[in-house]
Amino acid sequence: MKNNIEEQLELPCGSILSNRLCKTAMTEGLSDQLNRSTDELCTLYEKWSKSGASLLITGNVQIDRRYMERAGNVAIDGKQSNIQIEKLKKWASAAKINGNHCWVQLGHAGRQTDARINKVGLGPSPIRSRNIAGQIFMPSYAPKEISKREIDSIINKFSYAAKICKEVGFSGIQIHSAHGYLLSSFLNPLANVRTDNYGGKLENRYRLLLEIINAARRTVGPNFPISVKINSSDFLRGGLTDQESATICKALDSERIDLLEISGGSYENLAIFRGKDAFNDKNINEAYFLDSSREILNTIKNTPIMLTGGIRKLSTMNDLISNHNIDMIGLARPLCGLIDGPKKLIKKEIYELPKYEDKINYPFFLRWLKIFRFGKVIYKAAILLWCYDNIINISKNMPFDSKGEKINLINIIIKMYIYEWKKASSLKKIKSRGLVYRQNF
């Protein structure tokens, strides 16, 4: 019997995805000192192109080099040199070598800007993130409140970056409005207390997102896929609720976007890492954000929906597509170890992807830390650091941990901490001031 994941999907713009599996965005940290694409990115994405997934979405490509979530982000910020264009073309070509789609995730780190690069992030309001779990060793600072002039500039930067992505050969873009980054923080009433047209009531808080989508659409035309990634909920008391998210998604559904990816949480909350209900600590073993997405699923009429977060079993994937109005399945961490996991699922060589997060080696003398929130953050952040390390090794054609046998908490934290520090120290020609990189604005 044919799996549901094998079925094609036609997008509203007319593009066709050959199956229902997507490698979703994961930050790679592989750019050069000028935040340009590299041969390592080409190697990595050529391998993922052969994974069997019909769609690859790149990690954060920043539209402003001053505000990056990692020093190794690629950036499309302003006029691109001939060298930059050629590097992007090479990346796009490698990422589509197997006939799949590759879309660029465009984003702005906002108040979650890596403090090693820039201590002064940018936010809708000057409100500091309460706990940046993803940067557990980095202090967070109150961001600068974005002005109307800067809002206009950001809209133009997203639109221009979308234009470049189309010109160099990528097959679509995704606008990142989840996980607490700039566009997500505009939606979050805890982060956005503005009193102008971009704050206050819900339709004002999602105004910037709609303006960016419309500007990008005018630039790339009607036949180029545009996706949006959004939280089903922030899982923060007083933050964006699932009901509000459903209202936003209804507005997006009228904007003729081509794929809506549903995720959840932010670096202020463990839901992004652990797959638990943030309010009652209830374990959710698969499809972390399905329950919080119910209202969205009942609201959307025109836009295909992709669900991301903890989906591992083939039976679950097929059930989501058959019975829950899910059109695409988003996969991330498993493809850092089992690169050809989608192909194996389609061929029924396997029936479940590995759950590497269950294999973390927490030293015995530190296990008591898991009692506390801080310890839980470190424990769950370790799997992301393991993904980062594997991504680096895969990109360099080096041996990597395909079975999750080397997830040692302390070793991986130290190794990646050094890597990130060196990467931030190596940046060139960027005007910002951080804990490592110290040019003046």
Predicted region positions:
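Flavin-dependent oxidoreductase catalytic cores
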Residues: 1-441
